[in-house]
Amino acid sequence: LGTGSLGLVAGAFAGFMIFSSICPCELMPGGVLFGETVDTPVANWNNTTANQENLCQLQIWAGIRPHSINLNCMATPEGELFLSCSVCDRKYWAARVEMDEEAVIRLGDLLYPVLLNRETDPVAMDRSFRARVNKLQYTDLETMVTPRPPLDQERFDHWWTFRVTSRT
């Protein structure tokens, strides 16, 4: 590589790292998530801030680059963690999640290495959806991106959920 090409690569890398430190933001995906990595396995996600966060951040790998997004996550009373995804068949990130997909969840300033699996069991999906409805009753209205659902809201047919398990 010549000096000009090396400078271009270095500039692109620096730009991507700056972009990653700012996003994901609102609807724009980001790159690498930064924070302190939690090395201890999480058995009960109620012992984290999952249900206190308006939005969680998820980082997956899309080919050779990191791809991060904001989305709803919720811990069930049993301590399971799930991700919420409406109209998920059209979401870029969801199409890239395979069985036991390695990912990172950021809750506050903490990074949790996790595995993702799409949940298809109707009983588990209903349990996850109930946790979503309950969490959204207490979400800050000023920063809320999902409308507050009624407590008796039924699970939507277009709604997917992903089970999150600790991989450390």
Regions flagged by a language model, labelled:
Residues 1-22:
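Hydrophobic membrane-insertion alpha-helices, especially the h-region
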